């Protein structure tokens, strides 16, 4: 861990009413004496002059001093809050750098110091960047929940449960004559099942949190001329795709990134799916399936003039059967302006079915509400925590090891192998909060932060 004293502008670059310079490290007191002529009282706002090396006043403002470890970074921290002109702030940083042993902070280094000094865990540190980058009230609320430790709490509980079960299993192994009895008495199995269930709940919440942060990838798929491109245009609010009566007009993947009440949505229009000998169209269809396989949701577009069916298994069983097992599907019966169908939503065998006219826009607003709901939008802002893709991957790894451990227990009564799978699950979960994390990962995470955070 670095022992350097670092300085950076904590407010956004440019012109503003107030500009803040932040200093963290052992030399913060030296900076106070050099720039202010005195050390401000801890946690008191001190209005004073900021002076250069010859004693001339650079600016006037508020100085705040926080004595470590009772500060954001866990070190001595000095904040100089002056006027927000960039020239003035640059002059002030230059003055601070004249004090021996001070250097400019790297992006995210203040938060990294807080993490290293156990003031934050890794999910809380990441939540700072997510709160700054939030594009909706829901994302901001969820990021704040993570910053306050809600996600960390769930992960710590899982780690503790896995660790305790692992210790119990290893204790059973220490008594080989009784190991089979320990493993078959149901106590270990019940504890393992409870952990798997809890992890599944956390995974679902994290998946929702990831969608709130990163957006939901929605693929519009169906047969040619079902109205996929018209729906893309209707959702995007502009003519993004060429629309004609000729089947197969769209031959490549088209993407639009929009926000629904601040919630990011990535919409992808794909080539119509059908058997074809056209080489270019075949490539487009292959790309369409690649997008479908990595989607968060599929909007299955159906030309309502060609069938009265609402169950997707009746409409196109081969398509539905080829979809990934856990991929959510919303059925869109298009061309309601021609069929005269009521513009309503129904549930059919577990599938949401919407009747719309992509051409006229009828029913599209209701579909947008549906998509917002899938992304976790809540008007009362009572949401969960925010999560990143790396969190989902770590949870998936942990879940995989727990399932393997379950197999070792149920099929083979193999205590040593179960203990090893529990250990691997524990490591995967601990990576989320940074308890066991490589330096390379830490560098990648904090380098994406703003300078001054």
From Swiss-Prot:
Residues 215-376 form the TrmE-type G domain. Gene3D superfamilies: P-loop containing nucleotide triphosphate hydrolases, Probable tRNA modification gtpase trme, domain 1, tRNA modification GTPase MnmE domain 2. Homodimer. Heterotetramer of two MnmE and two MnmG subunits. This is tRNA modification GTPase MnmE. The keyword DNA repair does not apply. Mg(2+) binds at residues 229, 250. It is an enzyme of class 3 (hydrolase). Its cofactor is K(+). It is found in: Cytoplasm. K(+) binds at residues 225, 244, 246, 249. CDD domains: trmE, TrmE_N. Binds 1 potassium ion per subunit. (6S)-5-formyl-5,6,7,8-tetrahydrofolate binds at residues 22, 79, 119, 453. GO terms for biological process: tRNA methylation; tRNA wobble uridine modification. It comes from Shewanella putrefaciens (strain CN-32 / ATCC BAA-453). GTP binds at residues 225-230, 244-250, 269-272, 334-337. The gene is mnmE. One of its GO terms (cellular component) is cytosol. Exhibits a very high intrinsic GTPase hydrolysis rate. Involved in the addition of a carboxymethylaminomethyl (cmnm) group at the wobble position (U34) of certain tRNAs, forming tRNA-cmnm(5)s(2)U34.
């Amino acid at each position: 861990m670095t022992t350097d004293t670092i300085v950076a502008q904590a407010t956004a670059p440019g012109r503003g009413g107030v500009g803040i310079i932040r200093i963290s490290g052992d030399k913060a007191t030296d900076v106070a004496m050099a720039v202010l002529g005195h050390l401000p009282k801890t946690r008191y706002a001190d209005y004073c002059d900021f002076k250069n090396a010859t004693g001339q006043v650079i600016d006037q403002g508020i100085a705040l001093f926080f004595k470590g470890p009772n500060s954001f970074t866990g070190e001595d921290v000095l904040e100089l809050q002056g006027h927000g002109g960039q020239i003035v702030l640059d002059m002030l940083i230059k003055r601070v750098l004249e004090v021996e042993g001070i250097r400019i902070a790297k992006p995210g280094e203040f938060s990294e110091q807080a993490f290293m000094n156990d003031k934050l865990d890794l999910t809380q540190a990441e939540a700072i960047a997510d709160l700054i980058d939030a594009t909706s009230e829901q994302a901001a609320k969820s990021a704040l929940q993570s910053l306050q430790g809600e996600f960390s709490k769930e992960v710590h509980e899982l780690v503790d449960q896995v660790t305790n079960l692992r210790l119990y299993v290893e204790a059973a192994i220490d008594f080989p004559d009784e190991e089979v009895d320990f493993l078959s008495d149901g106590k270990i199995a019940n504890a393992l099942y409870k952990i798997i269930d809890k992890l599944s709940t956390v995974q679902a919440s994290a998946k929702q949190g990831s969608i709130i942060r990163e957006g939901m990838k929605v693929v519009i798929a169906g047969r040619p001329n079902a109205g996929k491109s018209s729906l893309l245009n209707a959702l995007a609010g502009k003519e993004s795709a060429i629309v004609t009566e000729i089947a197969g007009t769209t031959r490549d993947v088209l993407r639009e990134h929009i926000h629904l009440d601040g919630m990011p949505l990535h919409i992808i229009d794909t080539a119509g799916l059908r058997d074809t000998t056209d080489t270019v169209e075949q490539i487009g269809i292959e790309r369409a399936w690649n997008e479908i396989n990595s989607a968060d949701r599929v909007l299955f577009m159906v030309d309502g003039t060609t069938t009265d069916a609402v169950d997707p298994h009746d409409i196109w069983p081969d398509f539905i059967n080829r979809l990934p097992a856990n991929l959510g599907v919303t059925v869109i019966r298009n061309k309601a302006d021609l069929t005269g169908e009521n513009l309503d939503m129904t549930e059919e065998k577990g599938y949401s079915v919407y009747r719309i006219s992509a051409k006229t826009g009828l029913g599209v607003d209701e579909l947008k509400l549906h998509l917002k709901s899938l992304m976790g939008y809540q008007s009362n802002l009572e949401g969960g925590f925010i999560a990143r893709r790396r969190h989902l991957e770590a949870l998936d790894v942990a879940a995989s090891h727990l399932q393997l451990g379950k197999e070792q227990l149920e099929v083979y009564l193999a205590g040593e192998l179960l203990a090893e799978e529990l250990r691997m699950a524990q490591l995967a979960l601990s990576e989320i909060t940074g308890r066991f994390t490589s330096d390379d990962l830490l560098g990648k995470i904090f380098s994406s932060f703003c300078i001054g955070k």
